[in-house]
A protein has these predicted regions:
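Bacterial N-terminal signal peptides that target proteins for export
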Residues: 1-10
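Surface-exposed binding patches on compact interaction domains or structured appendages
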Residues: 107-131
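N-terminal small/polar-rich segments of proteins
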Residues: 24-106, 134-172
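N-terminal signal peptide c-region/cleavage motif recognized by signal peptidases
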Residues: 15-20
């Protein structure tokens, strides 16, 4: 065999080996990733106590009072008006938030009255009696409490005011 035939045979063998390696390298590979999901029960909120400001006397002077009901059922007046708090039944609004322990949530709230005459109406920031606000404790139930406030002055119509505190709870 001459050198030329040897080189051609060697080149052919080399080319065949290269094509064979390329064919093997272009094959497919695969792997698997585990998948999981945790399905939770819906978060729930239930009212357990109404929001009751009790009775107040509007100021007779030209100044206003802010009526404040705190989360511990206490009504106070601030401002320079000469209004009064009358001894009467009062209560903060109470709600139970139910969800799996450790669930974090947020709330939105709105306080309104049907009758006109009260101004600067606002719910208080929610407080809790068990655990950190917005985190359901180990029991799976968190009580949240709301007070509220509004302004009155000598022009506020004397009447019974009715309304609602609407609270929405959302998973974080």
């Amino acid at each position: 065999m001459d050198t030329r035939k040897i080189l051609i045979a060697a080149g052919s063998a080399l080319a065949f080996a290269a094509f064979a390696t390329g064919a093997l390298a272009s094959g497919s590979v695969s792997t698997t990733a585990p998948a999981s999901v945790t399905v939770l029960s819906p978060i729930n909120i239930t009212k357990t106590q109404n929001l009751v400001f009790g009775q107040v006397v509007r100021p007779s002077n030209a100044n206003a009072n802010t009526v404040i009901l705190d989360a511990n059922d206490t009504v106070t007046l601030t401002g320079t008006g000469n209004g009064l708090v009358v001894a009467s039944t009062t209560s903060s609004a109470k709600f139970d938030v139910t969800a799996p322990a450790g669930t974090t949530y947020s709330t939105t709230e709105a306080l309104s009255f049907t009758q006109t005459g009260l101004t600067n109406i606002a719910p208080s920031t929610p407080t809790t009696t068990n655990g950190s606000p917005g985190v359901v404790p180990a029991s799976g139930i968190q009580e949240i409490r709301y007070g509220g406030q509004f302004d009155i002055d000598s022009s506020t119509p004397p009447q019974t005011y009715t309304g609602a505190l609407n609270v929405t709870v959302n998973y974080n």
